[in-house]
């Protein structure tokens, strides 16, 4: 998750309510995008998983599959110069053929 422009098929999960990210994912899928990636780090990881599960089970049952799940960590430098590791997750989902 590098800084800069975000690709149009990526939903970055943060501090907003889960349904905001569900709506963003559904909007992308309804616009014809066949694959999207849900990305989060730190405490937002559980919200990213919830987003995928809500899209997959409540809104588009039997139409979405999880393509891949990538986990990792990033080194983040705080304002006072300390470095810490933050966990990351990227969940790729796509429409079933």
From Swiss-Prot:
Describe its function.
Binds double-stranded DNA tightly but without sequence specificity. Involved in DNA compaction.
Database matches in InterPro entries: Alba-like_dom_sf, DNA/RNA-bd_Alba, DNA/RNA-bd_Alba-like
Q: Which GO terms describe its biological process?
A: chromosome condensation
Sequence positions bearing N6-acetyllysine = 15
Alphabetized, the UniProt keywords read:
Acetylation, Chromosome, Cytoplasm, DNA condensation, DNA-binding
Q: Where in the cell is it found?
A: Cytoplasm; Chromosome
A Pfam family annotated for this chain is Alba
Q: Name one GO cellular component term.
A: chromosome
Q: What is this protein called?
A: DNA/RNA-binding protein Alba
- What modifications does the entry list under PTM / processing? Acetylated. Acetylation at Lys-15 decreases DNA-binding affinity.
* Family of the protein in this entry: Belongs to the histone-like Alba family.
Q: Name one GO molecular function term.
A: double-stranded DNA binding
């Amino acid at each position: 998750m590098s800084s800069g422009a975000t690709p149009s098929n990526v939903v970055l999960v943060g501090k907003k309510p889960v349904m905001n990210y569900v709506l963003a994912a559904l909007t992308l899928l309804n616009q014809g995008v066949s694959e999207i990636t849900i990305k989060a780090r730190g405490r937002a990881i559980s919200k990213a998983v919830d987003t995928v599960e809500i899209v997959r089970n409540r809104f588009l049952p039997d139409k979405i599959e999880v393509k891949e799940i990538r986990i990792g960590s990033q080194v983040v430098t705080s304002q006072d110069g300390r470095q810490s590791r933050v966990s990351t997750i990227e969940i790729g989902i796509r429409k079933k053929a």
